[in-house]
Amino acid sequence: MLSRIEQELAQLGITNVKEIVHNPSYEQLFEEEMKPGLDGFEKGVLTNSGAVAVDTGIFTGRSPKDKYIVYDETTKDNVWWTSEAVKNDNKPMSQSTWENLKDVVTHQLSNKRLFVIDAFCGASKTHRLAVRIITEVAWQAHFVKNMFIRPTADELKVFEPNFVVMNGSKVTNPNWQAQGLNSENFVAFNLTERIQLIGGTWYGGEMKKGMFSMMNYLLPLKNVASMHCSANVGKEGDVAVFFGLSGTGKTTLSTDPKRKLIGDDEHGWDEHGVFNYEGGCYAKTINLSEENEPDIYRAIRRDALLENVVVAEDGSIDFADKSKTENTRVSYPIYHIDNIVEPVSKAGHAQKVIFLTADAFGVLPPVAKLTPEQTKYYFLSGFTAKLAGTERGITEPTPTFSACFGAAFLSLHPTKYAEVLVQRMEAAGSQAYLVNTGWNGTGKRISIKDTRGIIDAILDGSIEKATTHALPVFDLRVPDALPGVDTAILDPRDTYAEAAEWHAKAEDLAARFVKNFEKYTTNEEGKALVAAGPQLSK
C-alpha cells in the first residue's frame, strides 16, 4: 500500500521511489550534505563559520535563455510574451514539448531516493502559494527550506500543494534541437498544471526566482502589487520599500539597525499592507566583510548555505575570491538576522517607496522626490548602470533598463505592475523617491555614509522640509540641503569642474532613456508619461 506522499508523487508520474525524505530537519539535511559517499556537485563542504558550502557547477547564475512558459488557454492572453520588437525571457512552449520534458524529469526522479520539501511562498494566507519541491539533491532541499516560508507542524499536517517544483538538475533534454529550444537545459512553467520543471542546471536561484515569476503572474491579476524590492518598518509602524536591480543596495540599505526587516527581495502589497514572499535571504557575498555588512556576515553560520565560494583547507572562506564567479551567494533563514518582523514577515502599507539606481554615467542626483507621473516613468524604465572595463582599461558605463526593476521576473506586461503599484501608493498616500547610489563627477561612488544619510532623511521625513530646485534635462526636484549629507554632492553639476561636462553627459543619458521608453508608447497611457521623463534639447 502506497503512503499518501507516494500516491501524490505517482500522480505526477514519479514512481517506485526508493525512499522519500519528507520535510527533513536542518540537522538531517546537514548529515545528508556531509555524507562521505557524495561526489560532484552533491557534496557539501563544512566551513569554519559552521555553514555548509556547495558548488552549483557551470551554472553560477540563472539561465534566462532557457526559460519557457507553456502557451495555452490560461496564458495566451495574459503573459507578456517575447517578441521580435521587445525581447524578454517569456518564451512560449507547446503542450507536446512540455509533456516530453515532464517525462524526462519524472523518469529521472523515479526509482530514486528523493527529498520533498513543503513550504509557502507568501506571508499572506490569502495570497500565498503552497509549494512542494521535489529533488534528488540534499543541498537543494536545504536551499528551499532556507528560502521559502517554513510551515508550522500543524500546517504541515494539512498541507496541500497548489504548485509543484520538480528539480531534475541531473538530467538534460536530448530533443532540444528538434523542439526548437535554446539548449539541452530548461526551466519551464505550466500555469494550468501549476508545475515548474528544471533540467540541466543546479543553480538554486532557479527555484526561488521561478516561484517569484509565478507570484508575478498570479497576484497583479488580483490587484495585488508584486514587487522586486526589499522592505522594512520603523518603530512607529512606518513601512518603506526599496526597489532596485542587483548591486544597487537593496539588501544593504534595508538592513538598518533602527528598523525591522520585512524581507530583502520579493514582496506583495495587498489591501492589508506589504508582505514578504520568502522565509529567508539570498545575499551576495563577494567582498563581504564584517565591518561593512555585519548582519549578513553574522548570518553565515550553521544552517546557512554558501554557493560557489572558495574554501581553504582549514575551512576558512576568502570572500574576495571570484575565481568561480562574481555571483557568490549565501542563503539563510530570515531569523539569522536579529532585527526582523516576527512571527510573520508582513507589515502595513508603505509610506515611502524608494527606487535605487547606481548611475555610472555620473548624471543623476543622489536623491530626487518624484511626482506621480515620474514615479510611473522611472518604475517602467528601471534604470541602473555598471562600469565595465574595456580592452584599453577605460571604464565605460553600461546602461541597464529593466522594467519595474525586475524585467527578468515579470510574467505580465510591465504597465500592469506600474498600474497596481500606483493604485496601492495612491490609496496609502505614499511618496516615491529616486536614490542614486552610483558615481558622480568626482569619479568616485557616492559614499555609503551619504546614502544612508539620504535614506534617513526620507524615512524620518526631514527631506519634506528641505527646499528644492529643479535639475535641468531630467526636471527632477533636488533638495538644497539635508542633515548629515555632504551638501556639495546633492546637485550632481557641482561635482564637475565644469557644469557643461555634466550637461553633455545628461543629454547622452537622457537620449538613452527616451529610446528605451519608446516601447511603452504604443498606448495612450504610455504616451502620456513621456512628458514625465527627460527632455532632449531640440
From Swiss-Prot:
Stretches assigned to coiled coil: none
Single GO biological process annotation from the record: gluconeogenesis
Segment forming the signal sequence: none
A Gene Ontology cellular-component term: cytosol
Annotated binding of substrate, by residue: R62, Y203, K209, R329
EC number: 4.1.1.49
Subcellular location(s) per record: Cytoplasm
Annotated Mn(2+) binding sites: K209, H228, D265
Gene3D superfamilies for the chain: 3.90.228.20, Phosphoenolpyruvate Carboxykinase, domain 1 (3.40.449.10), Phosphoenolpyruvate Carboxykinase, domain 2 (2.170.8.10)
Domain of life: Bacteria
CDD domains found in the cross-reference section: PEPCK_ATP
Entry GO MF terms: ATP binding; metal ion binding; phosphoenolpyruvate carboxykinase (ATP) activity
Cofactor(s) required for function per UniProt: Mn(2+)
Family statement: Belongs to the phosphoenolpyruvate carboxykinase (ATP) family.
Quaternary assembly: Monomer.
Role noted for this protein: Involved in the gluconeogenesis. Catalyzes the conversion of oxaloacetate (OAA) to phosphoenolpyruvate (PEP) through direct phosphoryl transfer between the nucleoside triphosphate and OAA.
PANTHER family: PHOSPHOENOLPYRUVATE CARBOXYKINASE (ATP), PHOSPHOENOLPYRUVATE CARBOXYKINASE ATP
Protein name: Phosphoenolpyruvate carboxykinase (ATP)
Organism: Haemophilus ducreyi (strain 35000HP / ATCC 700724)
Source organism phylogeny: Bacteria, Pseudomonadati, Pseudomonadota, Gammaproteobacteria, Pasteurellales
Name of the gene this protein is made from: pckA
